[in-house]
UniProtKB/Swiss-Prot annotation:
InterPro entries: G_ENGB_dom, GTP-bd, GTP-bd_ribosome_bio_YsxC, P-loop_NTPase. The keyword Cell division applies. Necessary for normal cell division and for the maintenance of normal septation. It comes from Bordetella pertussis (strain Tohama I / ATCC BAA-589 / NCTC 13251). NCBIfam families: GTPase_YsxC. Transmembrane segments: none annotated. It comes from the Bacteria. This is Probable GTP-binding protein EngB. Signal peptide: none annotated. GO terms for cellular component: cytosol. Belongs to the TRAFAC class TrmE-Era-EngA-EngB-Septin-like GTPase superfamily. EngB GTPase family. Its cofactor is Mg(2+). The keyword Metal-binding applies. Gene3D superfamilies: P-loop containing nucleotide triphosphate hydrolases.
Length: 207
């Protein structure tokens, strides 16, 4: 069984100071509203309703943590998946956008247990201005980044690969960057992305 398939809900937090103390490795998921973040978490964890997306894009305001139980230490967590609020939806008030920017920036900058960042980008849109703003938070952290180019099934293979090269160029400021075309519905890139995330949590995954 994949390590990620053991994931279960751990805690929700509206503010950074409500998170548990930094400890076990954390992998966070960040992306523009409607980039397919919740769907990606669910398919990676082989669960239909682990992560929820709001019916109104941009309204998911909580940080949601999902624990990955340590099979050798009952009650302990081997690591966490952290679902950060989606950012940048046009209908959200400016004050709310600033609040989200503070949460995203604060978590990425200060969370000592952050082991890796999963950045979700809609492959049909490419890197938007909002994505570039987010890279301003990501690049200085020096953390490794897995860019999932979501909804890859919507593009033919040739166009898909051209977009990969274009996005790589746009994200050149991020040093340790790995890119995977990804589709939650067609399961494109699922195995590669899952293995990458598992390696951040535990280089030696217990079967």
């Amino acid at each position: 069984m994949s390590l990620l398939h053991r994931a279960s809900f751990y805690i929700s937090a509206a503010r950074l100071d409500q998170l548990p103390p930094a400890g076990a490795p954390e992998v966070c998921f960040v992306g523009r509203s409607n980039a397919g973040k919740s769907s990606a978490i669910n398919v990676l964890c082989n669960q239909r309703r682990l992560a929820f997306s709001s019916k109104t894009p941009g309204r998911t305001r909580l940080i949601n943590m999902f624990g990955l139980p340590d099979p050798l230490a009952p009650g302990e967590q081997l690591g966490f998946l952290v679902d950060l609020p989606g950012y940048g939806y046009a209908s959200v008030a400016h004050r709310e956008k600033e609040k989200w920017a503070d949460i995203l920036g604060g978590y990425l900058r200060d969370r000592a247990s952050l082991a890796g960042i999963v950045l979700l980008i809609d492959i049909r849109r490419g890197v938007t201005d909002l994505d570039r703003r987010l890279t301003n938070f990501i690049a200085p952290t020096g953390r490794p980044v897995l860019a999932l180019l979501t909804k890859a099934d919507k593009l033919p293979y040739g166009q898909r690969m051209r977009t990969v090269f274009a996005v790589r160029k746009d994200l050149a400021d991020i040093g340790a960057l790995h890119m995977v075309p990804f589709s939650s519905t067609e399961r494109i890139g699922l195995e590669e992305a899952g293995a990458h995330i598992e390696n951040w949590i535990s280089p030696k995954v217990v079967p």
